[in-house]
A protein has these predicted regions:
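Short, glycine-/small- and polar/acidic-enriched structural segments
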Residues: 74, 81-84, 88
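Active-site loop segments of alpha/beta catalytic cores
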Residues: 1-26, 51, 55, 85-308
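N-terminal capping/small domains of soluble enzymes
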Residues: 8-11, 15-78
Length: 308
């Protein structure tokens, strides 16, 4: 099997010659042009011979001119819908085009998008988001919808640049962040607006960040695969696959990737396969591996995956 066939079969629940794998980390290139970002991603992909590439997106969401952080109601009002290529998004789209030209015929790649709620939390000064929820909720909901509209437009353009799907990262679908009822008001409609925009893409992934996550209430999201830190929070990898009916991405503990020995890494991978079986499984970390993870450890993950 080639890489595209292997990943496509895993998503479909078919038989694979071996379990496909990938991992990712933050390159910290948000101040560099898209060409430099693309070069780093391509070099990373080739260094570890990944079965697919999850492209990082460290460029910030474009704020209106003159605003460094959202602080007050007037700032929220200025968050109008954006064009997909506005500001530094254009650099990320340039990176996607370069990546597609370099590897698009040999491997799938997906684009990282942070959910509207996660994005709004990054944009606001400390306390401003909670204040908006309490004092002017309608204004905040309108701003959230504008962010979602902008991200949906960007997601469509990313697919147009060759991405096989998006990796939608949810940063608040956890009980220490919101209740499920709160999430249904403040986040869910805006997550779905983005996913609906790229529903036909073959490789959309839902990443549920954090611990004590809202798992079951997200299972109707239109994605092909789900990713979460199952070494840190329920459900287990097997339970998650059974409850979701979707392909699961896991089996590698990002928190221990830094220091495990080669035998320990191989055991972690083999234990995950023994638990979950070979179908509807992609070997991946539950979140980004630390940027300073030694290359030898990542190579051990690659070797362990290639022996499945």
């Amino acid at each position: 099997m080639n890489k595209i066939e292997r990943v496509t079969q895993a998503l479909a629940g078919g038989e694979v010659d071996r379990i496909p794998f990938s991992f990712w980390y933050h390159f910290g290139l948000q101040h560099m042009p898209g060409r430099k970002h693309a070069e780093a991603e391509i070099d990373f992909y080739r260094a570890y011979d990944l079965d697919f590439l999850k492209v990082m997106n460290d460029y910030p969401y474009p704020l209106p001119r003159g605003i460094r952080a959202i602080e007050n109601p007037e700032d929220w009002k200025r968050l109008e819908p954006l064009e997909a290529s506005d500001f530094c998004w254009g650099e990320q789209l340039t990176a996607l085009s370069i990546i597609n030209k370099a590897i698009g015929e040999e491997a799938l790649f997906i684009e990282t998008i942070f959910s509207p709620w996660t994005t709004s939390r990054k944009l606001a000064r400390s306390g401003a988001l909670a204040e908006a929820r309490e004092k002017y909720p309608e204004l905040l909901l309108e701003a959230m919808d504008n962010i979602a509209t902008s991200l949906a437009s960007y997601a469509r353009e990313a697919i147009g640049r060759g991405a096989a799907g998006i990796f939608l990262s949810l940063g608040a679908a956890a009980y220490d962040q919101m209740s499920e009822d709160e999430y249904a008001i403040w986040a869910r409609p805006f997550d779905l607006k983005i996913l609906e925009a790229v529903r036909d893409a073959p490789f959309n992934v839902l990443h549920i960040h954090g611990e004590r996550i809202h798992f079951d209430t997200l299972l109707d999201y239109p994605v092909s695969a789900i990713n979460w830190s199952h070494f840190r929070t329920p459900p287990s990898l097997k339970e998650g696959r059974e409850r979701s009916g979707k392909t699961v991405m896991g089996g590698i503990d990002e928190a221990t990737a830094y220091y495990l020995s080669a035998p320990e890494i191989r055991k972690q991978v083999s234990d995950s396969i023994d638990e979950c079986g070979r179908r509807n499984l992609i070997l991946a970390p539950g979140c980004s591996v630390p940027t300073d993870t030694p290359a030898r450890n990542l190579l051990e993950v690659k070797l362990a995956a290639e022996q499945t």
